[in-house]
């Protein structure tokens, strides 16, 4: 259930900046995207074993949420998310991109993500540590349509380009992830609706829950 006590918390502006963005590399990112189906991952066996092991541990750190399910499969035909090692050269595609790793997602007509592929050139990425770090980061981006922010100085956040490997998920990343899937809805909440909701919620106080549920219309 949505925690309405945190609607206007300090994380609201952070959430807005990571999800509702517009730049030269995107036609329009003002519509939030969520995974509309359980994410079933197939990990390419050509990815180094140590990297695969670290990634499976990382996935176990992702917060549990009623609107988001994730699992692994050993059968590629059962997966809707393929993480692949490639020998191809991978170029920059967006300002979020680094060479040698990228992802592409399939969405339905309600902007729900239903499938994806993450490609990485493990050899060109260099060290095992670099492979682990970037796989974690790019996979996390793909779950929530998040983007990196240069303003994040913390080495603990996956959304920082200064991120270093950790055995835990930062509170910052956890709150943003949970917030994103709290906003899960059949009809996406566009940028102007999000801003309107935030303004009205601050005015309504204890009646905020009723108002917010009306904004998350399933009709």
Regions found by a protein language model. Give the residues of each.
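Extracytoplasmic
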Residues: 34-38, 65-67, 76-80, 113-115
